[in-house]
């Protein structure tokens, strides 16, 4: 049986401040580092091991993976970093407080921006300091590949080439894979693997620092999926994510 592990990064500073983060490269809090280390300890205790790891080019995911691999004594593991695993780009909302944005635009509108499948937030201007196109880490991307905003549909389209061309072939070779990424890039893969409808994806919330395990058949179709660890703590963490966009 094939097991794939997905892990959203530990709590970041902007998670704590309840801000839209997107492609902004904010670091983990002390709590986020603890969450990441605990995830590594839990994976080791449950008998997991890995042959290759994937993460984004944002430090909160990279550092989370470091902590996990350190706890598992797998720091030597090959790691592929890809912009395709970045968080969804939140456009002009990046940096804004979610509750304050809900007060201004209404909770319903913010829910649409945060969780709907095909409605992006207002776009950035290319002249905006938050536009990622001028950053060295994205120098190899075409102008069309650098987003000004994204909906989840855009994130799925961005991520799937990496899945089909790189990650899935490694899994088919029998390699054990961990992906340390972000709430919406993981939601993108969950939607694809589980064939979640556009309506139902609104209700899927990925908590920070809790490993999500997929058991897959030989065609990489899910047999089942489950989170490791305390299930009461998981439920509270998912509820906390869902409440972030309330006024």
From Swiss-Prot:
Positions of the record's site feature: Transition state stabilizer: 182
SMART domains associated with the record: PGAM
CDD domains: HP_PGM_like
EC number annotated for this UniProt entry: 5.4.2.11
Residues the record lists as binding substrate: 8-15, 21-22, 60, 87-90, 98, 114-115, 183-184
Gene Ontology molecular function: phosphoglycerate mutase activity
Name of the protein this chain belongs to: 2,3-bisphosphoglycerate-dependent phosphoglycerate mutase
Native source organism of the sequence: Chlorobium chlorochromatii (strain CaD3)
């Amino acid at each position: 049986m094939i097991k794939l592990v997905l892990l959203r990064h530990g709590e970041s500073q902007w998670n704590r401040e309840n801000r839209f983060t997107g492609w902004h490269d904010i670091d983990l809090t002390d709590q986020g580092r603890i969450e990441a280390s605990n995830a590594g300890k839990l994976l080791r205790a449950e008998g997991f091991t890995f042959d290759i790891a994937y993460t984004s080019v944002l430090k909160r995911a990279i550092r989370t993976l470091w902590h996990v691999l350190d706890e598992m004594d797998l720091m030597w593991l090959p790691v592929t970093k890809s912009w395709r695993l970045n968080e969804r780009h939140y456009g002009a909302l990046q940096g804004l407080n979610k509750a304050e944005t809900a007060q201004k635009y209404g909770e319903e509108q913010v829910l649409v921006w945060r969780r709907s499948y095909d409605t992006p937030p207002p776009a950035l201007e290319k002249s905006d300091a938050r536009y990622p196109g001028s950053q060295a880490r994205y120098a190899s991307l075409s102008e069309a590949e650098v987003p000004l905003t994204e909906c989840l549909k855009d994130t799925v389209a961005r991520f799937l080439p990496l899945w089909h061309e790189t990650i899935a072939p490694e899994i088919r070779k029998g390699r054990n894979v961990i992906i340390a990424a972000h709430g919406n890039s993981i939601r993108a893969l969950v939607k694809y693997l589980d064939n979640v409808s556009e309506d139902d994806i609104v209700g899927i919330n990925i908590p920070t620092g809790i490993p999500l395990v997929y058991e897959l058949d030989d065609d990489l179709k899910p047999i089942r999926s489950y989170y490791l660890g305390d299930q009461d703590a998981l439920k509270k963490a998912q509820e906390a994510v869902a409440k972030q966009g309330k006024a």
